[in-house]
Amino acid sequence: MRTLFIGDLHLSADRLDITQAFTRFLDTELDDADALYILGDLFEVWVGDDIALPFALELAEKLKQVSQKLPVYFIHGNRDFMLGKQFARAAGMQILPEVTCLNLYGIETVILHGDSLCTLDKAYQRFRKLRSLSLARWLYGCLSKKTRQGIADKIRSNSKSSNQQKSYTIMDVEPNAVDALFAKTHTKHMIHGHTHRPAIHQLANGCQRIVVGDWYEQGSVLSVSAEGINLQSLPFEHTT
Protein backbone atom coordinates (compact mmCIF):
# COMPACT_ATOMS: atom_id res chain seq x y z
CA MET A 1 0.00 0.00 0.00
CA ARG A 2 1.07 3.59 -0.57
CA THR A 3 0.05 7.16 0.13
CA LEU A 4 -0.17 9.60 -2.78
CA PHE A 5 0.53 13.34 -2.84
CA ILE A 6 -0.37 15.75 -5.63
CA GLY A 7 -0.75 19.50 -5.96
CA ASP A 8 -0.79 22.49 -8.27
CA LEU A 9 -3.21 21.08 -10.81
CA HIS A 10 -4.66 24.56 -11.41
CA LEU A 11 -7.83 23.10 -12.89
CA SER A 12 -9.95 25.48 -14.94
CA ALA A 13 -12.57 25.53 -17.66
CA ASP A 14 -9.82 26.69 -20.04
CA ARG A 15 -7.73 23.56 -19.52
CA LEU A 16 -10.16 20.65 -19.48
CA ASP A 17 -7.32 18.40 -20.67
CA ILE A 18 -5.85 18.66 -17.18
CA THR A 19 -9.20 17.76 -15.63
CA GLN A 20 -9.42 14.75 -17.95
CA ALA A 21 -5.89 13.68 -17.00
CA PHE A 22 -6.75 14.02 -13.31
CA THR A 23 -9.92 11.98 -13.79
CA ARG A 24 -7.88 9.22 -15.47
CA PHE A 25 -5.49 9.34 -12.53
CA LEU A 26 -8.38 8.88 -10.11
CA ASP A 27 -9.66 5.96 -12.16
CA THR A 28 -6.36 4.11 -12.62
CA GLU A 29 -3.81 4.98 -9.93
CA LEU A 30 -5.61 4.55 -6.61
CA ASP A 31 -6.29 0.82 -6.35
CA ASP A 32 -3.44 0.25 -3.87
CA ALA A 33 -3.56 3.67 -2.19
CA ASP A 34 -4.07 4.22 1.53
CA ALA A 35 -4.92 7.90 1.08
CA LEU A 36 -4.73 10.82 -1.35
CA TYR A 37 -3.41 14.20 -0.25
CA ILE A 38 -4.02 17.28 -2.43
CA LEU A 39 -1.52 19.95 -1.41
CA GLY A 40 -3.32 23.03 -2.65
CA ASP A 41 -4.02 24.86 -5.90
CA LEU A 42 -6.35 22.13 -7.06
CA PHE A 43 -8.06 24.95 -8.97
CA GLU A 44 -6.57 27.86 -10.89
CA VAL A 45 -8.89 30.18 -9.02
CA TRP A 46 -11.65 29.70 -6.45
CA VAL A 47 -13.77 32.66 -5.40
CA GLY A 48 -16.38 30.82 -3.38
CA ASP A 49 -18.27 27.55 -3.15
CA ASP A 50 -21.35 29.32 -4.51
CA ILE A 51 -19.62 29.98 -7.85
CA ALA A 52 -18.43 26.45 -8.60
CA LEU A 53 -18.37 25.89 -12.37
CA PRO A 54 -19.94 22.80 -13.96
CA PHE A 55 -16.59 21.07 -14.48
CA ALA A 56 -15.78 21.57 -10.79
CA LEU A 57 -19.12 20.12 -9.71
CA GLU A 58 -18.52 17.08 -11.92
CA LEU A 59 -15.09 16.69 -10.36
CA ALA A 60 -16.63 16.90 -6.90
CA GLU A 61 -18.84 13.94 -7.74
CA LYS A 62 -15.79 11.99 -8.91
CA LEU A 63 -13.82 12.79 -5.78
CA LYS A 64 -16.83 11.84 -3.68
CA GLN A 65 -16.76 8.38 -5.27
CA VAL A 66 -13.04 8.12 -4.54
CA SER A 67 -13.57 9.17 -0.93
CA GLN A 68 -15.86 6.20 -0.40
CA LYS A 69 -12.85 3.94 -1.02
CA LEU A 70 -10.04 5.89 0.66
CA PRO A 71 -9.65 9.19 2.53
CA VAL A 72 -9.02 12.31 0.44
CA TYR A 73 -7.31 15.21 2.21
CA PHE A 74 -6.95 18.81 1.06
CA ILE A 75 -4.69 21.69 2.09
CA HIS A 76 -5.48 25.16 0.77
CA GLY A 77 -3.16 26.74 -1.78
CA ASN A 78 -2.68 30.35 -2.75
CA ARG A 79 -5.16 30.02 -5.64
CA ASP A 80 -7.98 28.16 -3.85
CA PHE A 81 -7.79 29.46 -0.28
CA MET A 82 -11.51 30.31 -0.48
CA LEU A 83 -12.50 26.70 -1.07
CA GLY A 84 -14.87 26.00 1.79
CA LYS A 85 -16.66 23.31 3.71
CA GLN A 86 -19.56 23.18 1.26
CA PHE A 87 -17.45 22.08 -1.70
CA ALA A 88 -15.22 19.91 0.47
CA ARG A 89 -18.29 18.09 1.74
CA ALA A 90 -19.60 17.60 -1.79
CA ALA A 91 -16.21 16.21 -2.84
CA GLY A 92 -15.74 14.04 0.21
CA MET A 93 -12.52 15.87 1.06
CA GLN A 94 -11.24 16.54 4.55
CA ILE A 95 -9.68 20.00 4.86
CA LEU A 96 -6.44 19.97 6.85
CA PRO A 97 -4.61 22.84 8.57
CA GLU A 98 -2.14 24.64 6.29
CA VAL A 99 0.72 22.92 8.12
CA THR A 100 -0.03 19.32 9.03
CA CYS A 101 2.17 16.65 10.56
CA LEU A 102 1.53 12.98 9.93
CA ASN A 103 3.21 9.65 10.41
CA LEU A 104 4.03 8.08 7.05
CA TYR A 105 4.86 4.44 7.62
CA GLY A 106 6.85 5.25 10.74
CA ILE A 107 8.35 8.54 9.51
CA GLU A 108 7.13 11.82 11.00
CA THR A 109 6.49 14.18 8.10
CA VAL A 110 5.26 17.75 7.75
CA ILE A 111 3.13 18.61 4.71
CA LEU A 112 1.96 21.98 3.41
CA HIS A 113 1.25 23.87 0.19
CA GLY A 114 4.59 25.66 0.37
CA ASP A 115 3.85 29.33 -0.28
CA SER A 116 4.56 30.17 3.35
CA LEU A 117 8.18 29.11 2.79
CA CYS A 118 8.81 31.69 0.04
CA THR A 119 9.62 34.39 2.58
CA LEU A 120 11.86 36.44 0.26
CA ASP A 121 8.77 37.42 -1.73
CA LYS A 122 7.80 40.20 0.67
CA ALA A 123 4.91 41.55 -1.41
CA TYR A 124 3.23 38.16 -1.64
CA GLN A 125 3.74 37.44 2.06
CA ARG A 126 1.96 40.70 2.91
CA PHE A 127 -0.98 39.65 0.74
CA ARG A 128 -0.90 36.18 2.27
CA LYS A 129 -1.09 37.62 5.78
CA LEU A 130 -4.04 39.82 4.80
CA ARG A 131 -6.00 37.05 3.12
CA SER A 132 -5.52 34.78 6.14
CA LEU A 133 -7.48 37.16 8.37
CA SER A 134 -10.95 35.85 9.15
CA LEU A 135 -12.46 39.32 8.79
CA ALA A 136 -10.93 39.82 5.34
CA ARG A 137 -12.22 36.46 4.18
CA TRP A 138 -15.68 37.18 5.57
CA LEU A 139 -15.84 40.59 3.89
CA TYR A 140 -14.72 39.09 0.60
CA GLY A 141 -17.41 36.43 0.88
CA CYS A 142 -20.05 39.15 1.35
CA LEU A 143 -19.28 40.68 -2.04
CA SER A 144 -21.35 39.87 -5.10
CA LYS A 145 -20.29 36.96 -7.28
CA LYS A 146 -19.38 39.32 -10.11
CA THR A 147 -17.24 41.50 -7.84
CA ARG A 148 -15.44 38.52 -6.32
CA GLN A 149 -14.71 37.12 -9.76
CA GLY A 150 -13.41 40.50 -10.91
CA ILE A 151 -11.11 40.82 -7.91
CA ALA A 152 -9.80 37.29 -8.41
CA ASP A 153 -9.12 37.92 -12.09
CA LYS A 154 -7.26 41.13 -11.25
CA ILE A 155 -5.14 39.45 -8.58
CA ARG A 156 -4.31 36.59 -10.92
CA SER A 157 -3.31 38.98 -13.71
CA ASN A 158 -1.14 41.06 -11.38
CA SER A 159 0.45 37.92 -9.95
CA LYS A 160 1.35 36.62 -13.40
CA SER A 161 2.89 39.94 -14.40
CA SER A 162 4.76 40.30 -11.11
CA ASN A 163 6.12 36.75 -11.18
CA GLN A 164 7.65 37.33 -14.60
CA GLN A 165 9.79 40.07 -13.07
CA LYS A 166 10.87 38.17 -9.96
CA SER A 167 14.11 36.25 -9.72
CA TYR A 168 14.38 32.48 -9.45
CA THR A 169 15.56 32.82 -5.84
CA ILE A 170 12.66 34.98 -4.70
CA MET A 171 10.15 32.56 -6.21
CA ASP A 172 11.67 29.56 -4.41
CA VAL A 173 11.52 28.52 -0.76
CA GLU A 174 13.89 30.22 1.65
CA PRO A 175 16.26 27.75 3.40
CA ASN A 176 15.94 29.45 6.79
CA ALA A 177 12.15 29.17 6.57
CA VAL A 178 12.50 25.46 5.81
CA ASP A 179 14.85 24.96 8.77
CA ALA A 180 12.51 26.88 11.05
CA LEU A 181 9.56 24.69 10.10
CA PHE A 182 11.57 21.53 10.67
CA ALA A 183 12.49 22.82 14.14
CA LYS A 184 8.95 23.93 14.96
CA THR A 185 7.38 20.61 13.95
CA HIS A 186 10.20 18.38 15.23
CA THR A 187 10.34 16.57 11.90
CA LYS A 188 13.04 15.83 9.34
CA HIS A 189 10.85 15.11 6.34
CA MET A 190 8.78 17.67 4.43
CA ILE A 191 6.45 17.45 1.42
CA HIS A 192 5.09 20.52 -0.36
CA GLY A 193 4.23 22.01 -3.74
CA HIS A 194 3.70 25.61 -4.91
CA THR A 195 7.08 26.22 -6.59
CA HIS A 196 6.39 23.91 -9.57
CA ARG A 197 9.96 22.57 -9.21
CA PRO A 198 9.60 18.83 -8.52
CA ALA A 199 12.62 17.42 -6.74
CA ILE A 200 13.84 15.41 -3.79
CA HIS A 201 16.26 17.52 -1.75
CA GLN A 202 18.61 15.82 0.73
CA LEU A 203 19.49 18.44 3.34
CA ALA A 204 21.78 18.71 6.34
CA ASN A 205 21.17 16.76 9.55
CA GLY A 206 19.39 13.98 7.68
CA CYS A 207 16.50 16.20 6.62
CA GLN A 208 14.63 15.68 3.37
CA ARG A 209 12.40 18.09 1.42
CA ILE A 210 10.25 16.75 -1.42
CA VAL A 211 8.52 19.04 -3.90
CA VAL A 212 5.62 17.75 -5.98
CA GLY A 213 5.31 19.23 -9.45
CA ASP A 214 2.51 20.99 -11.28
CA TRP A 215 0.12 19.55 -13.89
CA TYR A 216 0.52 22.08 -16.70
CA GLU A 217 2.19 19.79 -19.26
CA GLN A 218 2.12 16.47 -17.40
CA GLY A 219 0.98 15.08 -14.09
CA SER A 220 3.21 14.86 -11.03
CA VAL A 221 2.62 12.34 -8.25
CA LEU A 222 4.59 11.47 -5.14
CA SER A 223 4.10 7.92 -3.91
CA VAL A 224 5.20 7.07 -0.37
CA SER A 225 5.20 3.53 1.01
CA ALA A 226 7.01 1.49 3.63
CA GLU A 227 9.48 0.55 0.89
CA GLY A 228 10.40 4.12 -0.03
CA ILE A 229 9.40 7.12 -2.12
CA ASN A 230 8.82 7.65 -5.83
CA LEU A 231 8.32 11.06 -7.45
CA GLN A 232 6.97 10.38 -10.90
CA SER A 233 5.58 12.17 -13.93
CA LEU A 234 2.35 11.14 -15.63
CA PRO A 235 2.24 12.02 -19.35
CA PHE A 236 -1.05 13.40 -20.59
CA GLU A 237 -2.94 11.33 -23.13
CA HIS A 238 -3.55 13.70 -26.02
CA THR A 239 -6.53 12.86 -28.20
CA THR A 240 -7.03 14.01 -31.78
From Swiss-Prot:
Positions annotated to bind Mn(2+) 1: 8, 10, 41, 196
Recorded name of the encoding gene: lpxH
Membrane topology: Peripheral membrane protein
Functional pathway: Glycolipid biosynthesis; lipid IV(A) biosynthesis; lipid IV(A) from (3R)-3-hydroxytetradecanoyl-[acyl-carrier-protein] and UDP-N-acetyl-alpha-D-glucosamine: step 4/6
Chain segments annotated as coiled-coil in the UniProt record: none
InterPro entries: Calcineurin-like_PHP_ApaH, LpxH-like, Metallo-depent_PP-like, UDP-diacylglucosamine_Hdrlase
EC number: 3.6.1.54
EC category name: hydrolase
Cofactor: Mn(2+)
Catalytic activity: UDP-2-N,3-O-bis[(3R)-3-hydroxytetradecanoyl]-alpha-D-glucosamine + H2O = 2-N,3-O-bis[(3R)-3-hydroxytetradecanoyl]-alpha-D-glucosaminyl 1-phosphate + UMP + 2 H(+)
GO molecular-function terms, A-Z: manganese ion binding; UDP-2,3-diacylglucosamine hydrolase activity
Residues given in the record as Mn(2+) 2 binding sites: 41, 78, 113, 194
GO CC annotations, alphabetized: cytoplasm; extrinsic component of plasma membrane
Cofactor: how bound: Binds 2 Mn(2+) ions per subunit in a binuclear metal center.
Gene3D superfamilies, alphabetized: 3.60.21.10
Family: Belongs to the LpxH family.
Summary of the function given for this chain in its UniProt record: Hydrolyzes the pyrophosphate bond of UDP-2,3-diacylglucosamine to yield 2,3-diacylglucosamine 1-phosphate (lipid X) and UMP by catalyzing the attack of water at the alpha-P atom. Involved in the biosynthesis of lipid A, a phosphorylated glycolipid that anchors the lipopolysaccharide to the outer membrane of the cell.
GO biological process: lipid A biosynthetic process
Protein name: UDP-2,3-diacylglucosamine hydrolase
Binding site for substrate: 78-79, 121, 159, 163, 166, 194
Keywords from the named record: Cell inner membrane, Cell membrane, Hydrolase, Lipid A biosynthesis, Lipid biosynthesis, Lipid metabolism, Manganese, Membrane, Metal-binding
Locations listed in the record: Cell inner membrane
